[in-house]
């Protein structure tokens, strides 16, 4: 009887995966951190501001309970649901200009 009870406890712990928390990259640190309870979705939100042409899109990384919906046009949100799946997006390399480009 004790063996059966112990087996049931072990199976329950394995099946429930007690204490698991999703980890996502979080800005501004861009470090992997555990998400708060109930937030199992990682997101990457990008948008342009007044300096987009100079420094590229702004980026916000974080956790959410569900995939956020953009509140304005021009905001892109990508969601995923595995640990640390919301890496910082790569920016295309800009071309350095020279004095010859500006007569």
UniProtKB/Swiss-Prot annotation:
It comes from Pseudonaja textilis. The keyword Lyase does not apply. Keywords: Acetylcholine receptor inhibiting toxin, Disulfide bond, Ion channel impairing toxin, Neurotoxin, Postsynaptic neurotoxin, Secreted, Signal, Toxin. Belongs to the three-finger toxin family. Long-chain subfamily. Type II alpha-neurotoxin sub-subfamily. Binds with high affinity to muscular (alpha-1/CHRNA1) and neuronal (alpha-7/CHRNA7) nicotinic acetylcholine receptor (nAChR) and inhibits acetylcholine from binding to the receptor, thereby impairing neuromuscular and neuronal transmission. GO terms for molecular function: acetylcholine receptor inhibitor activity; ion channel regulator activity; toxin activity. GO terms for cellular component: extracellular region. The keyword Transferase does not apply. CDD domains: TFP_snake_toxin. This is Pseudonajatoxin b homolog. It is found in: Secreted. Expressed by the venom gland. Residues 1-21 form the signal peptide. Disulfide bonds join 24-42, 35-63, 48-52, 67-79, 80-85. It comes from the Eukaryota. The lineage of its organism: Eukaryota, Metazoa, Chordata, Craniata, Vertebrata. Pfam families: Toxin_cobra-type. PROSITE patterns: SNAKE_TOXIN. Its main location: secreted.
